[in-house]
Each structure stands twice: as structure tokens, then as C-alpha cells.
Amino acid sequence: MKTIHFDMNKYETHVDLEYLKEHGRVEKISDGVIFCSGLENAALHQAVLIDERHRGVILELNEEFVGIGLIDKTNDILEGMHVGVSGKFIEVDLFEEMAGRIIDTTGKMLYEESEEKPTATSPLFCVTPAIMTIDSVTRPLNTGLAVIDSITPIGRGQRQLILGNRQSGKTQIAVDTIINQHDQNVHCIYVAIGLKAAYIAEVIETLRNHGAMEYSTVVATAASDSLTAQYLTPYAGMALAEALRDQGKDVLIILDDLTKHADAYRAITLLFNRPPGREAYPGDSFYIHSSLLERAVQMNEEHGGGSITAIPMIETLSDDVTAYIPTNVISITDGQLFLKSDLFNRGQKPAVDVGVSVSRIGGDAQHPIIRKLSKNLTLILSQFEELKELLDFGNALDDGSMKMVSDGRLLTELFKQKILSPLSVTELIVILYAFQNGFLTKIPPANIQTFKGLLLEKAHMHKDFESFSAQIEAINELNESHVEMLEEIIRETGRLFS
């Protein structure tokens, strides 16, 4: 067999092979992704420029082409246009002060122009912290919601999933949690992934009206933005969180929501002709979420002592938690809050289903007094749900069972909470102490909310309550003076209520 020797010198036009290593040509365009030739030195997640002006990122590499996702939605890209790699991996710009900013996936300000230059950058994709740099979760992150802080507490450095149907109150829990951090020295990052622009604006306005934008950053892509921008958004939020964590800060990141993130990634991979798997999602769907969420940790003191607490959200269909994406994220996180539409429609807000919700490591971070006052609340609510079904069928119950029903009904009413009205640790202690010591047994369930409002009002009027609140972090158990104060507050409220 004769060997064919290819001699380029016999041709008048020479091909610059070195040029092709860093440059390429648009060969095909398809719904926000482009197929490109050349770019032999291209690497996954490298930033590129198409025609020197359109931003993109390399998302697919194979023998035939380089797949690029367009960050900016545009119809101006044509076949044959020049593509050049920047030599950098996709990054988010960081500024001296990040609080109050509303940015896109690369750190560019949204809704307003800014001449300020970035002081640093942070890579969107990086490895998770080494296990020897991570510490245990021992400090609480209080949401201000009684049912969560008492039964399914969250610690700083934890990953706690919120899942439920549409319109079941997922975002409201996140917003309440952000607002509750106003005096907790926590930087909050709200990441909106593929939501309606009007909805994002509403959340931002709520945060601004409650002063929460003073310690918060919003990373947002709307449903009208490109698929690639939606896919990159949570990584941009996490990159910003890591930069703040490395400064020794505590960070709370809300990911709203990862269902839309998975849908955007599915669409991108199908456009690149990757083989679909379960529910048409690609085979690495688990990886894209695990590699994201495992970056949320509590660092040890030798590595700054900062933390990232992640609260991702997942939208379910008909309360089905066995679908592909929900089961994936449940297995990645340290616990989940399951919101039921049935509870929400009955006026139980937050609509947390205590029987399915769990916090695997948050209990270690819970305040000792709240942990003691909350130890049997899950059992009370579980027994109430079981016995309530018997009552619905008209079955007679013994006195012991009726006591369980009465306690469960009281506790259910006690856990109802108006939106944008978070409770402090000491306010929660007052409420739980009143319940656990039988002070609410004579209060009709219909009047519990009124009684709770009067109780908290009376607590703030008590001469010792302010000093009790100031010292609560250092108090591990209630002493005689604390008990005397609490019972005095409850008795005074009882006299007012009667």
C-alpha cells in the first residue's frame, strides 16, 4: 500500500495551522447555540467572542465541531463569522461593594449603567473545597419562620432544599429568610433563573422596601434571556458567594429555581444532539447540580471560617417528589422542606408538610433553648394528622387521643405566620414556652393568632425582654429569672385577652 504524502508547499494559499488553534468560523446556528470549526485549543467553559462583539461560552467539544452557547440573545450572528477564544474561562466580575447590585451572569449591571471597573473576578466553574478545609455546621441560620426554625432548622453552611408545586409559597419563604438576616451579618444572594421579568422586579422591590438590598445581591436572568445565560446563572451566584466566603463572610444563596435550570440545560444538550436519558434530561444532570451545591460549605478557621448556606428550590408537579430532578436534588442536599398546595389552599402558611420535611444536620446548629422547647413538636403534628383522618370519618376518640388532636390543632394555628413578619429567636422562645407549658390550652384555635400578636406585643413592653434578647446568643438554658419573665408576660397577655 502506497503512502500518500501531503505537501502544502505546492499550493499558493497556505493554511495557518497556528491561527486555527485560537480562531474559528461559525458553521451553523441553532436556537441560541452555534457550531464552530477551528478552535483546536478550545477548552470547556472558555469564554469566546463572535465577530469581536457577541459573548459566548464553550459548552460542547467533539471531533467534528466546537459547540458554543450564546450568553447574549441576538439574531445578528451569521454563518462564516469569526470566532476567537479569550484565553480565559467564564468569570463573574466583582466590585468593591456588591451589596445592592442587580447583575447578570457575568457581573454586568442590569437596569442601570455603571462606569465602575471591576476589582476582581471569580470563576463560574471550579472544584469543591477539599474535605480537610471544611468544618461542621454548628451555627444557626434563622429564617424567622416558626415552623422551620423549631422543627427543621437550618445551619450556616447547610444545603436545604425547598420543593413544592407552583404557587405554594417557595419564593416567599426565601424572601422572608433574606429579610430576617437584617441584623445577622449575613450577605444574601438571590439568584433568579429563567423567571418572568415582572416577577423578578416584584421580588427586588419587596427586598428594597424592607431594607434587605443593603446586604443583598441579585443575580438574574429572565425567561426571555438566552438558554445559556439561564444555565450559567446559578454558577455565577455561587462564584460570587465563594468570593465573599473567602473573605470570611457568611453567605446565604437562594437558587430560584433549579427546575428551570435543568430545563435550560436539557434544551442546550438536545440542541447539541447529546443522547437524552430519563425524562429527556442528559446523563450528567445529577452532576451539574451536585457540582454546584457541594460548593456550599462551612470553612474551618484555618481557611477563613466563612460559610455558604444554599437554599435551592425545585418545582414539583402534583406534589410528585419521585420525579427525576426532585429525587436528584433531595439526594444532594442536607434536608428538604416540602410545601403542599393543599395546606397552602387551606390557609396553612408557610405550607410545610412536617411529615415529609427534614433537616439532617440543622439540629446541631439550633439554639439550645429552642432545641429543648421543640423536641416533641414533630410527634405532636404527626399524631394530629393521623387522628384528624379518623375524626373526618366521625370516629369517636378517647380522652388521650382528643388531647393529641387539641394540641396538634393549637400548634398548627401557632405555626401560621403572615408574610414578611419574621420572628426573632427570643420571640420564638416566648411562643414555644407558652405552648409547651400549657398556657394555650384554654385559648380557642380560632383566637390563637390574635393571642400570639398580643403576646409578642406584651413581650416587647416587658422591662427585661430587651436585655434577654441582647444576651440570647450566650444563654444556653432558661434560668429562674428568665422563666419568671416569660410567665409574667404570658399571664399579663392572658388577662388582656380574657
Curated annotation (Swiss-Prot):
Q: Which Gene Ontology terms of cellular component type are present?
A: plasma membrane; proton-transporting ATP synthase complex
Q: What's a GO biological-process term for it?
A: proton motive force-driven ATP synthesis
The compartments listed are: Cell membrane
Q: Which reaction does it catalyse?
A: ATP + H2O + 4 H(+)(in) = ADP + phosphate + 5 H(+)(out)
> What Enzyme Commission number does this protein have?
7.1.2.2
Identify a single GO molecular function assigned to this protein. proton-transporting ATP synthase activity, rotational mechanism
Q: For the site Required for activity, which positions are given?
A: S357
Q: Which family does it belong to?
A: Belongs to the ATPase alpha/beta chains family.
NCBIfam families listed in its UniProt record: atpA, PRK13343.1
Tell me the subunit arrangement. F-type ATPases have 2 components, CF(1) - the catalytic core - and CF(0) - the membrane proton channel. CF(1) has five subunits: alpha(3), beta(3), gamma(1), delta(1), epsilon(1). CF(0) has three main subunits: a(1), b(2) and c(9-12). The alpha and beta chains form an alternating ring which encloses part of the gamma chain. CF(1) is attached to CF(0) by a central stalk formed by the gamma and epsilon chains, while a peripheral stalk is formed by the delta and b chains.
Report what the protein is called: ATP synthase subunit alpha 1
Organism listed in the record: Listeria monocytogenes serovar 1/2a (strain ATCC BAA-679 / EGD-e)
Write the lineage as a comma-separated list.
Bacteria, Bacillati, Bacillota, Bacilli, Bacillales
Encoding gene per record: atpA1
